[in-house]
């Protein structure tokens, strides 16, 4: 009986091995077929990212137009968007992981494009009735709230699509192929996103400058409505045409069902702490209610994650990077709205944003060269202070009398600083990859993203407090001070690791001056 069982097991293993070999041999589909589905993926992702990047740029212009002398509406929208991402971002990731691909596709594209269409429609109504705020303030407020909520839902839906395509499908489609295939797909997908970030503001700015603001809102709403169907057809074609995605979908459905069964069958834990047994009605003699709550909070996974983060060697670089999110010195909602208020043409703002994105893209080429010569730690130092030096131009623009020149100085300083900013970002990320243990890497990454989103939210809250565009100089000084604090923290970290900051002896001119000033030992 045992021999028969062993023979049956061996036979099953041989069948599985043969099936695996059969699957591995013809894994690569015909080049034309695979190329077609990869192109479908790229085109669908481009359409989705174009909608997201267009709304990201346009919403600031709409808000400053609706409330011309205040950054209040733009700051409120930015705060709602950042807050929703910070709070619901992890939930979106769990939701994407727990559903099958078809449901994720349908919900992602439905909510993203529907919410953007609703937001665009609300903006159109607000722009068509220019005096709605004075004529009917409740309706004006309802449309503003609708725009904010729809925009936040659109951003969360976009996050779901980004996780699905960038973190899942690209990996699944490249399974069984050389690593260069995944590298190429990642590069193309990142290039699509950066191209959308580069070009959509330019196109939108041209429409606003040479047609009208209303035309841009109508174009955006129509684009979101039409492309929803095209995106769904492209992505569902990829899902149906790539067997690896179908097999991955079956595995994730099985994992989801297994987790549900394990959750139902999990044993009920019984507390062994005196005074907490079921049916016990008395109060513990030595522990008050507040102490019990504090004890539970200290043992929660949330507090545990932060404890792990602050115990890392790279906590100072992580905090330094997060502090850079507490700024208005970027082509974000607040600065874009301020430039619009200053009278800078919209297409110029779009071009400036495009130049900024191009400079940031160059950082991915310069960083490997510097890192190979200076090490990751020192590359972070040099890149950070190069960014800080460029931001001095933004600070100097505060004392320039002519508003247009000051605005162009602000844009130039921000655009130039992107090279150092993104190089510093890459340096900190690489330090976390190298120095954080594998068991803590996801926890540290999650806390880092949470900290960055929280500081980004604080920047928008600051914009709500200082909402007059005339007072943007206050936000500029606060942002520059925060950046300076981040630089000091990173410099302290480097000094703590290396016991020095610069190699003065490696600077020939400085070395000669020092030796000329100091007396020789023979003369002493």
From Swiss-Prot:
Pfam families: FPN1
Keywords: Ion transport, Membrane, Transmembrane, Transmembrane helix, Transport
Region Disordered: start-end pairs: 1-30
Membrane topology: Multi-pass membrane protein
GO BP term, pick one: cobalt ion transport
Gene Ontology CC: plasma membrane
Signal peptide: none
Transmembrane segments: 70-92, 109-129, 137-157, 191-211, 218-238, 314-334, 347-367, 380-400, 409-429, 446-466, 472-492
Ranges of biased composition (kind: Basic and acidic residues): 1-18
Gene Ontology terms, MF aspect: iron ion transmembrane transporter activity
Subcellular location: Membrane
Function as written in the Swiss-Prot or TrEMBL entry: May be involved in iron transport and iron homeostasis.
Family affiliation: Belongs to the ferroportin (FP) (TC 2.A.100) family. SLC40A subfamily.
Protein name: Solute carrier family 40 member 1
Organism: Arabidopsis thaliana
Phylogenetic classification of the source organism: Eukaryota, Viridiplantae, Streptophyta, Embryophyta, Tracheophyta
């Amino acid at each position: 009986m045992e021999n028969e069982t062993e023979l049956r097991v061996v036979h099953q293993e041989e069948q599985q091995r043969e099936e695996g070999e059969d699957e591995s041999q013809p894994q690569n589909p015909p080049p034309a077929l695979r190329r077609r589905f990869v192109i479908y993926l790229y085109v669908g992702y481009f359409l989705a990212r174009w909608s997201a990047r267009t709304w990201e740029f346009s919403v600031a212009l709409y808000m400053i137009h609706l409330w011309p002398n205040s950054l209040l509406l733009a700051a409120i929208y930015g705060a709602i968007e950042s807050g929703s991402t910070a709070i619901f971002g992890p939930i979106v990731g769990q939701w994407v992981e727990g559903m099958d691909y078809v449901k994720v596709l349908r919900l992602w594209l439905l909510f993203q494009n529907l919410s953007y269409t609703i937001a665009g429609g609300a903006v159109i109504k607000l722009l068509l009735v220019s005096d709605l705020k004075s004529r009917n303030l409740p309706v004006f407020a309802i449309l503003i709230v609708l725009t904010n909520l729809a925009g936040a839902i659109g951003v969360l839906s976009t996050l779901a699509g980004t996780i699905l395509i960038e973190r899942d499908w690209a990996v699944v489609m490249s399974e069984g192929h050389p690593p260069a295939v995944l590298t190429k797909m990642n590069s193309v997908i990142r290039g699509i996103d950066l191209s959308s970030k580069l070009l959509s503001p330019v196109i939108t700015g041209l429409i606003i400058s040479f047609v009208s603001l209303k035309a841009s809102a109508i174009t955006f709403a129509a684009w979101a409505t039409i492309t929803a169907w095209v995106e769904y057809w492209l992505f569902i074609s990829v899902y149906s045409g790539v067997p690896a995605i179908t097999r991955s979908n079956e595995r994730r459905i099985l994992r989801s069902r297994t987790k549900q069964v394990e959750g139902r069958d999990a044993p009920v834990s019984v507390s062994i702490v005196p005074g907490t047994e079921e049916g016990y009605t008395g109060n513990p003699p030595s522990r008050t209610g507040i102490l019990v709550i504090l004890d539970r909070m200290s043992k929660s996974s949330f507090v545990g994650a932060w404890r792990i983060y602050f115990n890392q060697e790279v906590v100072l670089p992580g905090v330094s990077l997060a502090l850079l999110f507490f700024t208005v010195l970027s082509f974000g909602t607040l600065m874009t709205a301020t430039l619009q208020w200053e009278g800078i043409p919209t297409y110029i703002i779009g071009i400036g944003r495009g130049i900024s994105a191009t400079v940031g893209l160059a950082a991915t080429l310069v960083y490997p060269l510097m890192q190979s010569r200076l090490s990751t730690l020192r590359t972070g130092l040099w890149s950070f202070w190069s960014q800080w030096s460029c931001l001095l131009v933004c600070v100097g623009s505060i004392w320039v009398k002519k508003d247009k020149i000051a605005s162009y100085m602000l844009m130039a300083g921000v655009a130039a600083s992107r090279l150092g900013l993104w190089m510093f970002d890459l340096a900190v990320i690489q330090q976390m990859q190298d120095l954080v243990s594998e068991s803590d890497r996801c926890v540290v990454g999650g806390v880092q993203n949470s900290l960055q989103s929280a500081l980004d939210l604080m920047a928008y809250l600051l914009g709500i407090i200082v909402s007059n565009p005339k007072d943007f100089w206050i936000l500029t000084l606060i942002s520059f001070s925060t950046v300076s604090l981040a630089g000091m923290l990173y410099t302290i970290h480097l000094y703590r690791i290396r016991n020095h900051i610069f190699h003065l002896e490696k600077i020939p001119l400085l070395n000669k001056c020092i030796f000329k000033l100091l007396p020789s030992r023979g003369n002493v």
